[in-house]
Amino acid sequence: RWELEKAMEVYAANDCTVISDEIWSDLIMPGYTHIPTQSVSRDARERTVAFYAPTKTFSLAGLIGSYHIIYNDRLRCRVQRQGNLSGYNDCNVLSMHALTGAYSDEGMAWLDQLCAVLDRNLRYIRDFLQSRYPGVTMMLPQGTYMLFVNCGAWCRSHGITPDDLRRRGVEHG
């Protein structure tokens, strides 16, 4: 929360409009809570355009189901005016049912199970990498299933650069 509060102070001091990608906000690992950008202050609520979508979390890519939350009337009008130009943002019947199902009690129960499985898998990957590749470190994510692996110490101990490691991964898999 404090990171968002500090960032919003900088944005307020510079009169910035904030676009907040909250699309991963449903995919939170056990023991953590998502903090929406707009919730940290009244100013954050007024200057932030927040985008959400069930597509990544519920594997609904390809369906039109993203949405935004904009409290500021001026910003909302600007976003809607631009969004309406493409004609692509009109929700269809399939998308409406998918969105409703995703956020139903059954969908939330499925999501809880998914997050528990992802958490176990992420811990397995961390333990595997650290046991087989001394010097490789990573932090478990609080949300999403994306990993950022630090191979710097492992590369130094093997006399290669991170670019060499990346190249080997591309060329040899």
Model-assigned labels for residue ranges:
Residues 1-173:
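PLP-dependent class I/II
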